[in-house]
Amino acid sequence: MLNEIFNKQKTQSEKSLEALKKDFTTLRTGKVNTHILDHITVDYYGTQTPLNQVATVLASDASTISITPWEKPLLKTIESAIAAANIGVNPNNDGESVKLFFPPMTREQREENVKQAKAMGEKAKVSIRNIRKDANDAVKKLEKDKAISEDEAKKAYDEVQKLTDTYTTKIDESVKSKESELLKV
């Protein structure tokens, strides 16, 4: 019974940590990352389709992303979708592909991204605390139903807190790592 609670807490906490790391990929660092385009969809025969499912998206160098559609008529649609996404660059259509040239990041942009990373970390911590609350509620229910003793409940609460502390520390480490990556010129 208790192991199920701990395993569920661990699994959910791991998902929160993975979600944080996925969120971090949307932040621009010193070099471009194609994940910055993950949220962009294009109209593909009447259906909104993720950009990476209708084109090859490559980082050709540290400041350029090249998008080559699998079908030429999509060039204009891709160009419009990127312009509408407001990611801070203007798309350049050369007839074969759409190129995005990212200027070097300013100190202010880096600091803004650090703020966003910290906010993402806080959101992940809130998620971890909610998972802890759910686990504690499950332990409390077992104790109330006399399925476990008071001593077992105390140990279970301690274990839940230990798991919470572990994942909170992992989140702090991830944020700190991302912060140093963002501030590196």
From Swiss-Prot:
GO terms for cellular component: cytosol. Coiled coil: none annotated. One of its GO terms (biological process) is cytoplasmic translational termination. Transmembrane segments: none annotated. The keyword DNA-binding does not apply. Pfam families: RRF. Keywords: Cytoplasm, Protein biosynthesis. One of its GO terms (molecular function) is ribosomal large subunit binding. It is found in: Cytoplasm. Its main location: cytoplasm. It comes from the Bacteria. The keyword rRNA processing does not apply. InterPro entries: Ribosome_recyc_fac, Ribosome_recyc_fac_dom, RRF_sf. Responsible for the release of ribosomes from messenger RNA at the termination of protein biosynthesis. May increase the efficiency of translation by recycling ribosomes from one round of translation to another. NCBIfam families: frr. Belongs to the RRF family. This is Ribosome-recycling factor. It comes from Campylobacter jejuni subsp. jejuni serotype O:6 (strain 81116 / NCTC 11828).
